[in-house]
Every structure is written in structure tokens, then in C-alpha cells.
UniProtKB/Swiss-Prot annotation:
Originating organism: Mycobacteroides abscessus (strain ATCC 19977 / DSM 44196 / CCUG 20993 / CIP 104536 / JCM 13569 / NCTC 13031 / TMC 1543 / L948)
Catalytic activity annotation: a quinone + NADH + 5 H(+)(in) = a quinol + NAD(+) + 4 H(+)(out)
A Pfam family recorded for this sequence: Complex1_30kDa
GO molecular function: NADH dehydrogenase (ubiquinone) activity; NADH:ubiquinone reductase (non-electrogenic) activity; quinone binding
NAD listed as a keyword: yes
A GO term from the CC aspect: plasma membrane
Sequence similarity: Belongs to the complex I 30 kDa subunit family.
Name of the molecule in the record: NADH-quinone oxidoreductase subunit C
Subcellular localization(s) per the UniProt record: Cell membrane
Keywords assigned: Cell membrane, Membrane, NAD, Quinone, Translocase, Transport
Annotated gene: nuoC
Subunit structure: NDH-1 is composed of 14 different subunits. Subunits NuoB, C, D, E, F, and G constitute the peripheral sector of the complex.
Enzyme Commission no: 7.1.1.-
Membrane topology: Peripheral membrane protein
Length: 228
């Protein structure tokens, strides 16, 4: 599937060293990596294949509703590596998801879960939640993506629209700290209830304990030598 011309990615920062380590604690033995951090930007029309049909129909469905328009709800549309991602404002996520599920020409009946992503350099949009959706009726797949700041990490839960997201939203809350408002039981699902922090954020400390081996003591990862 091919679409229109892809715009250059947006550079949001520079990665230095491996494993996302910042400042110190690089335990790789090599800290000379310098790599731009980039995110895809909105794609040009035509998107290709059924992508245009999905976006056009969603725009029409939202236009028929009283309290929201397509321009209000959708921040952008990205086609990257033959995948369609619709970026939605958090306050309109439930309405967009319900439109995608219920409209006969869209019929995205199934959510395959939700994944969290942490972009520390994406200012005021550091935490992203990505929902893969599938239309069994039309054999189509798209993704919804929402971005919120670390300072206010609230996203409406999609549990009422897609019950399959129940435990996935709990896991995303557990590991990334995204708070899914109106979730029926938003508690940690893998870490202990009293655990401090969210382990899959890129600024989460590596931690560890000293390890003794052949008479030598190896320091925890956070305290080892940096090779920069």
C-alpha cells in the first residue's frame, strides 16, 4: 500500500549514549552514540488504499454530531510504514472511538489493547497512548494515538467502548503513569501496589544492588562508570 509524499520527520531532540541514559550511568562500555530523536508528522493526501476512505468517513460522521467536529477532535493523520495513525485530542477520544466502532462504513469493532510510549523530549506531550483498532467486517486496521503531558497525564478510558482495553489500560497506567479516567478499577496490574514510580518511563532509574563476584564488588547500574 502506498500513499502520498511523506514529509520529513520532526526532530524533537538528540539521543546521546545507549539505553536512553542521561548524564551518567552508561554501562554499555560505549557512550559515543549521537542520534536525532524524531517523530513522523502529518502525511499528505492521498494516504493510499482504504486509508482515505476511513478518514473521509470519520470526518463525515463527526460533522453530523452536535458537539464536535473533525477539526476539533483530530490533530493529524500519519501514514508511516503502511500504517494509518489518527492523532486525537484526549478530550474527544471516546467520541472518536465510538464513531469508529458504530458507523456501518467504519465498523472498527475490536481494540487490540493500548500501548504506552514515553517521549521525554516531546514537550508538553511526553506520554502517548496508542490504541490498535481492527475492523473484522472490512478487514482493516488503524491506530488511534493520544498525547498528554507528564504534568497532567489524564486520558479518558475506552473501557466502555472497547471492554478489551480493561487490563491493557491498567498495565499502561502501571508502567507509564497514564491515568485513564473513568476506568472501573485502575490499579497496578504487575508491580506491587506500593511501588514507587513507573518502570517503563525513559527517566526511570535502572536501580539494582551491588553484586560480589570473585572477591570484587560490582556496583549497581546507576553507580557504574560512565564511558562518555
Amino acid at each position: 500500500m502506498t500513499g502520498g509524499e511523506q514529509k520529513p520527520n520532526e526532530i524533537i531532540g538528540v539521543r546521546r549514549g545507549l539505553f536512553g541514559v542521561r548524564g551518567s550511568g552508561d554501562t554499555s562500555g560505549y557512550g559515543g552514540l549521537v542520534q536525532p530523536i524524531s517523530l513522523p508528522v502529518s502525511s499528505n493526501r492521498p494516504y493510499g488504499g482504504y486509508f482515505d476512505q476511513v478518514v473521509d468517513r470519520l470526518e463525515s460522521v463527526l460533522a453530523e454530531q452536535e458537539n464536535v467536529t473533525y477539526a476539533d477532535a483530530v490533530e493529524g493523520v500519519v501514514v508511516y510504514r503502511d500504517q494509518l495513525t489518527i492523532h486525537v485530542k484526549a478530550e474527544h477520544l471516546v467520541q472518536v472511538a465510538q464513531s469508529l466502532r458504530d458507523d456501518p462504513q467504519l465498523r472498527f469493532e475490536l481494540s487490540l489493547g493500548v500501548s504506552g510510549v514515553h517521549y521525554p523530549d516531546d514537550s508538553a506531550r511526553e506520554l502517548h497512548a496508542v490504541y490498535p483498532l481492527m475492523s473484522i467486517t472490512w478487514n482493516r486496521r488503524i491506530m488511534l494515538e493520544v498525547a498528554v503531558p507528564e504534568s497532567d497525564p489524564h486520558i479518558p478510558s475506552l473501557n466502555a467502548v472497547y471492554p478489551t482495553t480493561d487490563w491493557h489500560e491498567r498495565e499502561t497506567y502501571d508502567f507509564f503513569g497514564i491515568i485513564f479516567d473513568d476506568h472501573p478499577a485502575l490499579t497496578r496490574i504487575q508491580m506491587p501496589d506500593d511501588w514507587d514510580g513507573h518502570p517503563q518511563r525513559k527517566d526511570y532509574p535502572l536501580g539494582g544492588v551491588p553484586v560480589e563476584y570473585h572477591g570484587a564488588t560490582i556496583a549497581p547500574p546507576d553507580q557504574r562508570r560512565s564511558y562518555n
